Amino acid sequence: MTAAVPNARLVDVELDESIGRSTPDVEHERAVAIFDLIEENSFHPIGDDTGGPYRLKLSLMESRLIFAITREAGEDVATHILSLTPLRRVVRDYFMICESYYQAIRSATPSKIEAIDMGRRGLHNEGSQTLQNRLQGKIEVDFNTARRLFTLVCVLHWRG
């Protein structure tokens, strides 16, 4: 992270509400991810030397992920539009394993739940790394921030 940039962090994250709401499990994941992201993150739009803190609005448009970044006071900083193609497979696989996980926590043995959860975490890490790589040269984030952002990308997909 660029040490010289003051307040290189997010103070607010908003998801495009026009997509609608999802299941209670997905909405819970969204709320936890946003809370955790705001509590602890490292976020710096490349080329912005003024510094944050920043607000982020995530949305989907025509199979593209949009990162609209402003300063805390509302001044536009940058908008980055990313193709979702590199994330599609891992997001699809993550959806499938999450469905298995949500079913398992209701009736499966602890060892089966643990095995599914390990696979779920592995896919989540893979998606987080892919997202971090896609943001390279645009937005500098640490891995934990990328993990929470990947969760929100998945929530947008679940809604859309």
Curated annotation (Swiss-Prot):
InterPro entries: UCP032146 (IPR008321). Pfam families: UPF0262. It comes from the Bacteria. Belongs to the UPF0262 family. This is UPF0262 protein Oant_0325. It comes from Brucella anthropi (strain ATCC 49188 / DSM 6882 / CCUG 24695 / JCM 21032 / LMG 3331 / NBRC 15819 / NCTC 12168 / Alc 37) (Ochrobactrum anthropi).
